[in-house]
Amino acid sequence: MMLRIPALLSPDEVRQCRQALEQAPWQDGRATAGPLAAQVKANLQLPLDSQAGQAIGNLILDKLGASALFMSATLPLKVLPPRFNRYEGGGTYGNHIDNAIFTIPGTAIKVRSDVSTTVFFSEPDEYEGGELIVEDTFGHQSVKLAAGDAIVYPGTSLHRVNPVTRGTRYASFFWTHSLVASDEKRRILFDLDQQIQQLTVRHPGDPALSALSGTYHNLLRMWSQA
């Protein structure tokens, strides 16, 4: 399932984050890539111990926790601290699938990359190219969202970032270890949850809502791996 989360960050928050990102020191993005990915990766990344990255990452995590859409779509158990990349001057990242398991820096905690997320910090008209191309069962999708928007998609998806030929593309990326590993099952739970929320508004107090809610939680109980 691919899902856009609009306005995860406010314009003021985006502006403050951009200022911090523009002033921060960057490193070659291949430093964090495996041998195969490094062959197709040409971008810059903030070091994992970057103070600016940690501060912005904490803001993103706070916003995700307050986003009912993100929580419903991803059913997070653990979220890897957000990372940050920068594309310019032809920078690109060719077709690849992300590692299945990541370790939270400074810990022994493992995070399975069930769901990938990208948060955009540059407006689409600030750069040419730079589309996130995701290929999966839902087809071939080209993603280039407004600053402050986020996109979530399965961690199993083949994806790439097209070359940025003008301007600079700033973004954050990270992975969520979901309570439900299967994308198909997460989609069923998400659709059911969204319908329950809509029916709650249209028909508050309807006894059928309790039954539907019970079905949702029984499915979650059956499928979750907490």
UniProtKB/Swiss-Prot annotation:
Its cofactor is Fe(2+); L-ascorbate. Its EC number is 1.14.11.-. SMART domains: P4Hc (SM00702). GO terms for biological process: DNA damage response; intracellular iron ion homeostasis. The keyword Iron applies. Pfam families: 2OG-FeII_Oxy_3 (PF13640), PKHD_C (PF18331). This is PKHD-type hydroxylase Daci_1172. It comes from Delftia acidovorans (strain DSM 14801 / SPH-1).
